């Protein structure tokens, strides 16, 4: 598989064309951002860790019959993926109150929710990715109601699989954000990544944060936290 022209450079990943028009190579960078890019740093090995963690998680999701864009992991930083048309939406799943939900609704961070909360945001940097509802998404042309039904069905399955996976690692899956895309064949699949960059992960015993909040909140120790998540996932895989 030959890597060709750069197609897209994002906050934490770069996407390259290949000699197969239906496939792309996703390269994980070491950039860390917060506040929609307002805060930025380069943290050695972060991209390698996220690539390894995402690979393990997508393997678990594949075993649960959840379709993803991942084909194979090529090396420390790169994955071969299906080329998809990304829905301009972020789907956020909240199992515990944290982050913007706590601020927006005046709820105490760490409160366990009786019901899982799904949110969608419109991916638009100029608008700071506003929170929208299903009707907004359809009015914007971002997705159809049928698309959203499929996305929510997949999201529920993903949350169940990930919650069980992390619980087995003694980690609480507080919340996470995911993206979906449509393949050339028309199938809606999970795209992008699932890593401590995109999840809030708290140690079950100590509530120690094992995610990008260590960067957002200037707590330090980001790579140590990501390595710990990877270690626990790898240990679980060996058992």
Curated annotation (Swiss-Prot):
Signal peptide start and end residues: none
Keywords from the named record: ATP-binding, Ligase, Nucleotide-binding, Purine biosynthesis
Keyword Ligase: yes
Record-level GO BP terms: 'de novo' IMP biosynthetic process; cobalamin biosynthetic process
Pathway terms, separated by semicolons: Purine metabolism; IMP biosynthesis via de novo pathway; 5-amino-1-(5-phospho-D-ribosyl)imidazole-4-carboxamide from 5-amino-1-(5-phospho-D-ribosyl)imidazole-4-carboxylate: step 1/2
Enzyme Commission code(s) on record: 6.3.2.6
One Pfam family of this chain: SAICAR_synt
Molecular functions per Gene Ontology: ATP binding; phosphoribosylaminoimidazolesuccinocarboxamide synthase activity
Catalysed reactions, as listed in the record: 5-amino-1-(5-phospho-D-ribosyl)imidazole-4-carboxylate + L-aspartate + ATP = (2S)-2-[5-amino-1-(5-phospho-beta-D-ribosyl)imidazole-4-carboxamido]succinate + ADP + phosphate + 2 H(+)
InterPro entries to which the protein is assigned, alphabetical: SAICAR_synt/ADE2_N, SAICAR_synt_PurC, SAICAR_synth, SAICAR_synthetase, SAICAR_synthetase_CS
Gene3D superfamilies: ATP-grasp fold, B domain, Phosphorylase Kinase, domain 1
UniProt cross-references to HAMAP family, sorted A to Z: SAICAR_synth
Family that this chain belongs to: Belongs to the SAICAR synthetase family.
Name of the protein this chain belongs to: Phosphoribosylaminoimidazole-succinocarboxamide synthase
Organism of provenance: Dichelobacter nodosus (strain VCS1703A)
Lineage: Bacteria, Pseudomonadati, Pseudomonadota, Gammaproteobacteria, Cardiobacteriales
């Amino acid at each position: 598989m030959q890597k060709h022209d750069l197609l897209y450079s994002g906050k934490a990943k770069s996407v390259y064309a290949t000699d197969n028009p239906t496939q792309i190579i996703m390269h994980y960078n070491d950039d860390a951002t917060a506040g929609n890019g307002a805060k930025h740093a380069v943290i050695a090995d972060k991209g390698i860790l996220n690539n390894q963690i995402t690979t393990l998680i997508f393997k678990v999701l594949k075993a649960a019959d959840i379709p993803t864009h991942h084909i194979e992991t090529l090396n420390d930083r790169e994955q071969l993926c299906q080329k998809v048309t990304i829905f301009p939406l972020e789907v956020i799943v909240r199992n515990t109150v944290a982050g913007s939900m706590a601020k927006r609704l005046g709820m105490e961070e760490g409160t366990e929710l009786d019901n899982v909360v799904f949110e969608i945001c419109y991916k638009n940097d100029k608008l700071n990715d506003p929170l929208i509802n299903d009707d907004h998404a359809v009015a914007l042309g971002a997705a159809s109601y049928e698309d959203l039904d499929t996305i929510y069905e997949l999201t529920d399955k993903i949350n169940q699989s990930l919650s069980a996976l992390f619980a087995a690692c003694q980690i609480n899956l507080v919340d996470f954000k995911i993206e979906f895309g449509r393949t050339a064949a028309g199938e809606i699949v999970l795209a992008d990544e699932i890593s401590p960059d995109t999840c809030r992960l708290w140690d079950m015993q100590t509530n120690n944060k094992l995610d990008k909040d260590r960067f957002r909140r200037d707590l330090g120790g980001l790579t140590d936290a990501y390595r710990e998540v990877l270690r626990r996932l790898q240990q679980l895989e060996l058992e």
